[in-house]
UniProtKB/Swiss-Prot annotation:
Protein name (database record): Phosphatidylglycerol--prolipoprotein diacylglyceryl transferase
A GO MF label: phosphatidylglycerol-prolipoprotein diacylglyceryl transferase activity
GO terms for cellular component: plasma membrane
Main localization, broad class: membrane
Location relative to the cell: Cell membrane
InterPro entries tied to this protein: Lgt (IPR001640)
Gene from which the chain derives: lgt
Pathway participation: Protein modification; lipoprotein biosynthesis (diacylglyceryl transfer)
Amino acid sequence: MLLGSVPQLDRVAIHLGPFPVYWYGIIIGTGVLLGLWLATREGERLGIPKDTFVDLVLFAVPIAIICARAYYVAFEWEYYMQNPIQIINTRQGGLAIHGGLIGAVMTGIIYAKVKRISFWKLADIAAPSILLGQAIGRWGNFMNQEAHGGEVTRQFLEGLHLPDFIVNQMYIDGVYYHPTFLYESLWSFAGVILLLLLRKANLRRGELFFTYLIWYSIGRFFVEELRTDSLMLGPLRIAQVMSIGLIVISIIFIIVRRKTGQADKRYLEK
């Protein structure tokens, strides 16, 4: 597709008859499948039945999507109150990661209780998978030309030594923008590597998951400052508030669980 004189990628991957299939959905689905593969592989190594994470994904993904959408809609209610039919339209994006995370965690807690499996064990195994899904999922935002930062020049983007397809896709309505999707994606990919390395450190159970929350939240806090489409509550950027909250809560949980003996078991214990 061409916009002005700048070639750009089409957000529609293919058409199945009259129905368009968007890259956004394909990319999100790819992230889920790769994350599932990673979690299932590690789960088997630690004695978790192979179908455990398959079952969990079947419950958690739909609930996470619903919660991600509900979270987004709640903070954009003034618009959706006037356009209620758009509430169910997610083809253009509009899924908030923090909302999805809340839904996934709630589902995981309930699932772990029903199956009588340690939630913290499941959460630790799933942590790199969740972050991998987020890293891949940001490229869905790239295809939709959303979740970008403020205005920049083409020279600025070329100075980052980005490939032309990224530079061109950041040209929206006659203006170039910060590729904040890329900053967050790279930060998340680095976090996946960190979490995979920390598996070998045999941390106390639950601490790998808290490390994920802390790592992602640090990156998200700074990236959010560049974005132009932040969900707001008065003068506050909701994602930054959530990021600070998750960092503080994670640190408190680590300290309290260690002091109270709730974190005696280690990651590699079966």
